[in-house]
């Protein structure tokens, strides 16, 4: 078991390093440059009156942003997550934690969050578990993950391509829909289903709507591509390495995934992430109908430096969003829905 934990920690450290490599970014497939907002030369409003308040789980939130789930369960993660949570405590951003998979078998792993929760009790956190682990885990154990973290909700992440390429991947997803439906019915928290960079089809989103998930984070192609990351890790496995190259552009982009969701007029909230790099990208997702927008790589890069760098990144994104709103004559986020170029 100890050897398994050591491999887990090394994998997570690899992920941090590889996620920052330009070769593992599907930026050439990023759709945001092909989508525009209508410029308003005479916006009849005062910049300081612009509100970026949104709704999350039927409650108003001051900021519509979340730091997308990134890393947990290893020593390097503690300082990274401390800086992220410290910044969130000052900006009122929400945060998804890295996978809590290790906490299911290692009780000590849960202690990673205790000092962070003690220092930053007001930060809105979301628990996180992979769909493959959901299938085999009792709901009572998942509820403990949420309760221990004092989390607002639970993210279930879906990563089929990553699992196929990852040398240690778990590729048995049989029973995932039944497990997800049971979770939604029995868990005492909102459930968010999230991709990890490959997006969602309309048919999958329709099924998610039918089982009653609270939100879907579309996380489409355009940012960090986990198939490419695992391909680098599988450099000594010629089959997986070649497969990673074959599927280097696999997935549905973030804007198309968001459009797929909007077209259903779903009961779930639509969260946008995947290649979102600035406040203008975020504005375009809000214009499509997203209510929350997530950032991962920009925050990871900043957190590797300092809390101040994370705060600078957050404040810049907020200012960019408000600039997009001012230059389209949008006083509130909903106004952006009328400002998308046809």
Swiss-Prot record:
Any GO MF annotation of the entry: magnesium ion binding
EC assignment:
5.3.3.2
Q: Which reaction does it catalyse?
A: isopentenyl diphosphate = dimethylallyl diphosphate
Binding site residues for FMN: 68-71, 99, 128, 194, 219, 224, 275-277, 296-297
Main role?
Involved in the biosynthesis of isoprenoids. Catalyzes the 1,3-allylic rearrangement of the homoallylic substrate isopentenyl (IPP) to its allylic isomer, dimethylallyl diphosphate (DMAPP).
State how it assembles: Homooctamer. Dimer of tetramers.
Q: Which protein, by its recorded name, is this?
A: Isopentenyl-diphosphate delta-isomerase
- Species the sequence originates in: Legionella pneumophila (strain Lens)
Phylogenetic lineage: Bacteria, Pseudomonadati, Pseudomonadota, Gammaproteobacteria, Legionellales
């Amino acid at each position: 078991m100890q050897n398994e934990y050591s491999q887990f920690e090394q994998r997570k450290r690899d992920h941090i390093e590889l996620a920052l490599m330009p070769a593992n970014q599907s930026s050439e497939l990023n759709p945001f440059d092909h989508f525009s907002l209508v410029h308003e030369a005479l916006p009849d409003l005062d910049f300081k009156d612009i509100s970026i308040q949104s709704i999350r789980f039927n409650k108003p939130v001051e900021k519509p942003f979340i730091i997308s789930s990134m890393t947990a369960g290893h020593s390097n993660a503690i300082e990274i997550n401390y800086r992220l949570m410290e910044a969130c405590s000052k900006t009122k951003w929400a945060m998804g934690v890295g996978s809590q998979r290790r906490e299911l078998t290692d009780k000590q792993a849960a202690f990673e969050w205790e000092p962070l929760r003690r220092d930053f009790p007001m930060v809105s956190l979301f628990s996180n578990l992979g769909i493959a682990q959901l299938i085999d885990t009792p709901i009572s154990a998942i509820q403990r993950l949420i309760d221990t973290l004092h989390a607002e909700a639970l993210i279930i992440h879906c990563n089929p391509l990553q699992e196929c390429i990852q040398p240690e991947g778990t590729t048995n997803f049989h029973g995932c829909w039944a497990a997800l439906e049971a979770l939604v019915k029995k868990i005492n928290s909102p459930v968010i289903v999230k991709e990890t960079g490959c997006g969602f089809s309309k048919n999958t989103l329709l099924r998610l709507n039918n089982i009653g998930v609270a939100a879907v984070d579309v996380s489409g192609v355009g940012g960090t591509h986990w198939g490419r990351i695992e391909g680098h890790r599988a450099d000594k496995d010629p089959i997986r390495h070649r497969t990673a190259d074959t599927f280097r552009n696999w997935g549905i982009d973030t804007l198309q995934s968001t459009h797929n969701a909007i077209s259903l007029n779903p009961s779930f909230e639509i969260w946008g992430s995947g290649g979102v790099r600035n406040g203008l990208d975020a504005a375009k997702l809000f214009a499509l109908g997203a209510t929350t927008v997530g950032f991962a790589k920009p925050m990871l890069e900043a957190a590797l430096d300092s809390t101040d760098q994370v705060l600078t990144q957050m404040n810049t994104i907020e200012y960019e969003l408000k600039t997009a709103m001012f230059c389209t004559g949008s006083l509130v986020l909903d106004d952006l829905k009328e400002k998308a170029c046809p």
